[in-house]
């Protein structure tokens, strides 16, 4: 998979390395030169920077020294603790870092074959729906012979500095990494989906049930190979880097390096005792300033845990920036968690698999309202439905749906200055079961995301069976940009873009006719259906000019709520729309009755309560039961 990563800027690693070895020169990257242009957007702030190769910084340079560890990393002078925290999380997952650092053994320095070294490295990152292979030379920025950005504990270990350089190249320059987002880096390292969680909402510090539920979700992400980060929000500039009395630092992104339930007690008593404590281990990218509260490295609470359990957890008494704390304390002191879940789409896995739909789209401006695709959020009602629209289906009675929208990063496309993200979000609407054309009026809103100027927005929601439309938007109309929409469901969702506003006119339209009316039929429910020992297992079918829409079966009730809609583009207005009610049975379904709907050219959404009829009867009430229906009709095909 990763050997097929797309070459960034068409730079081929193997070809460039072969050329350097043939010429016996060290690689110099023309696309990311050792100049101030690679450091800053504008100007040359700070001390004079000298670019040096690892061999000029130390005697025995290595990619890794004694393997890779979350303890390897330290933050540099740029405000990129978010990136260092993401790297710390990455370092704890061998299967993940080996994808980001491909063929690491081949890239490692070989003291026995110095002539095989060409000063060139490559790293893989997931960007905007695909893996890209980014090439860098080994020249690194230094001041007084010290690396000024991300660096390792060991002076001769360079993997983190080189990964950071490749990431800076992808972003445009090193300055672009100042004040970035951990969620973005976690996605770029994994191709997963980041879910931000605000710990200040929902009374998590005091509500044990909610806290336990969240811990189980965090534990599941960790146990299935995902990456997690946590932070304490700095409200003001003065808050940045402020140290709390408990030792935690505001404005820092901490890497979560372990999550587990810790058994309390000693010996057999501990084995049979049911009491366990929800614990989480974190690491500060600065490698110091640890938590000093309960369960810190030297706290007496560790006496409650057996020596073997402590050894298994890796508890050490060192000021190395890594520490344990209870999840309750974490919810009390931290304000944000980012869970980057690895979406499992493999059918061979024992864990839950997801079906992923991935679609690229864009917000574009146009003077013609039918071609404009930048309508802004729902606040702008006149233009909202001009945005891109995507339809998908939930095919189970209820399904957990994960939705992510990511805008194309602008940092790497604006060398004259820092590219700002647009404020983006999306709404999800429950629509007719057979909708094939774009929405033009409001329907039931099933869910909605927040609007925020981050690179991506995520929503996890439970949706009942049916068809839905996602409308991704910028907050303000007229803003343009590309985006990637990802929809994850338990079964295939058939997600696709709705491009047409109405049925297209073809050469057959003059012969077969063209729709004169659009009709939306909403069957709300029924009452008084034919008695059954176990209650009716009923469903409805809406029929119109050869097209059918069927509801889900409502089991064990004579007063079902169908809440099903159909939309029909009508050519033969004299023909009525028929709504049939059926009882589902094992061998053969039973007909319970039907109603006919005659529509006016412009029917309002009036509620009709109609008695069921037999198929051949003209009498209004010869069968038990009534059905409640709303009908909306319009001669304008873009009215609904």
From Swiss-Prot:
GO terms for biological process: proteolysis. Pfam families: C2, Calpain_III, Peptidase_C2. Disulfide bonds: none annotated. Residues 26-343 form the Calpain catalytic domain. Its EC number is 3.4.22.-. GO terms for molecular function: calcium-dependent cysteine-type endopeptidase activity. It comes from the Eukaryota. The active site is at 81, 252, 284. Residues 344-496 are annotated as: Domain III. Residues 499-617 form the C2 domain. GO terms for cellular component: cell surface; synapse. InterPro entries: C2_Calpain (IPR033884), C2_dom (IPR000008), C2_domain_sf (IPR035892), C2_III (IPR033883), Calpain_cysteine_protease (IPR022684), Calpain_domain_III (IPR022682), Calpain_III (IPR022683), Calpain_III_sf (IPR036213). Belongs to the peptidase C2 family. Calcium-regulated non-lysosomal thiol-protease. This is Calpain-5. The gene is Capn5.
């Amino acid at each position: 998979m990763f050997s097929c990563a797309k070459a960034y800027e068409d730079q081929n690693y193997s070809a460039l390395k072969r050329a350097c070895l043939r010429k016996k020169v060290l690689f110099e990257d023309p696309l990311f030169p050792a100049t101030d242009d690679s450091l800053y957007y504008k100007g040359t702030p700070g001390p004079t920077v000298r670019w040096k190769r690892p061999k000029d910084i130390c005697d025995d340079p290595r990619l890794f020294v004694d393997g890779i560890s979350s303890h390897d990393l330290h933050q540099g002078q740029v405000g990129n603790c978010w990136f260092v925290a993401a790297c710390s999380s990455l370092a704890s997952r061998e299967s993940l870092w080996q994808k980001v650092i491909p063929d690491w053994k081949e890239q490692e320095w070989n003291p026995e074959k110095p002539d095989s070294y060409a000063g060139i490295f490559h790293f893989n990152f997931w960007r905007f729906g695909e893996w890209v292979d980014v090439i860098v030379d080994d020249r690194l920025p230094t001041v007084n012979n010290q690396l000024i950005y991300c660096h390792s504990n060991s002076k001769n270990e360079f993997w983190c500095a080189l990964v950071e350089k490749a990431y800076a190249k992808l972003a445009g320059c090193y300055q672009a990494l100042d004040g970035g987002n951990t969620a973005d880096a976690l996605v770029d390292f994994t191709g997963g989906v980041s879910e931000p969680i605000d710990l200040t909402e929902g009374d998590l510090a005091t509500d044990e049930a909610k806290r336990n539920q969240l811990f189980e979700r965090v534990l599941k992400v960790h146990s299935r190979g995902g990456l997690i980060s946590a932070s304490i929000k700095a409200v003001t500039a003065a808050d940045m880097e402020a140290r709390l009395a408990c030792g935690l630092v505001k404005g820092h992104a901490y890497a979560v390096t372990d999550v587990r339930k810790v058994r309390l007690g000693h010996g057999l008593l501990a084995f049979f005792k049911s009491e366990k404590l929800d614990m989480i281990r974190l690491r500060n990218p600065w490698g110091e300033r640890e938590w000093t509260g309960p369960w810190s490295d030297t706290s007496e609470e560790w006496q409650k845990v057996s020596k073997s359990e402590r050894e298994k957890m890796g508890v050490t008494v060192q000021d190395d920036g890594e520490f344990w704390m209870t999840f309750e304390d974490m919810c009390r002191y931290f304000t944000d968690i980012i869970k980057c879940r690895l979406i499992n789409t493999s059918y061979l896995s024992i864990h839950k698999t997801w079906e992923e739909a991935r679609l690229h789209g864009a917000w574009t401006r146009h003077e013609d309202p039918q071609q404009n695709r930048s309508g802004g959020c729902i606040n702008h009602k006149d233009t909202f439905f001009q945005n891109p629209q995507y339809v998908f289906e939930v095919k189970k009675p209820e399904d957990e749906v994960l939705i992510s929208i990511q805008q194309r990063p602008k940092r790497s496309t604006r060398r004259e200055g820092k590219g700002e993200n647009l404020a983006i979000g999306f709404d999800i609407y429950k629509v007719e079961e057979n909708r094939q054309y774009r929405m033009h009026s409001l329907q039931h809103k099933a869910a909605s995301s927040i609007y925020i100027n981050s690179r991506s927005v995520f929503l996890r929601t439970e949706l009942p069976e049916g068809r839905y439309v996602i409308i991704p938007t910028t907050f303000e109309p007229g803003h343009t940009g590309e985006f990637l929409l990802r929809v994850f469901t338990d079964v295939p969702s058939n997600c696709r873009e709705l491009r047409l506003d109405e049925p297209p006119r073809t050469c057959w339209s003059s012969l077969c006719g063209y729709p004169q009316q659009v009709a939306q039929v909403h069957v709300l429910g029924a009452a008084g259906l034919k008695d059954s020992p176990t209650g009716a297992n009923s469903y409805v079918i809406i029929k119109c000019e050869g097209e059918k829409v069927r509801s889900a079966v409502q089991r064990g009730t004579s007063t079902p709520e169908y809440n099903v809609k159909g939309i029909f583009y009508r050519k033969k207005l004299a023909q009525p729309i028929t709504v049939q009610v059926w009882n589902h049975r094992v061998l053969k379904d039973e007909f319970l009755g039907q109603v006919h709907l005659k529509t006016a050219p412009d029917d309002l959404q009036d509620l009709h309560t109609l008695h069921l009829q037999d198929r051949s009867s003209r009498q209004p009430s010869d069968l038990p039961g009534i059905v409640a229906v709303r009908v909306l009709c319009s001669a304008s095909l873009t009215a609904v």
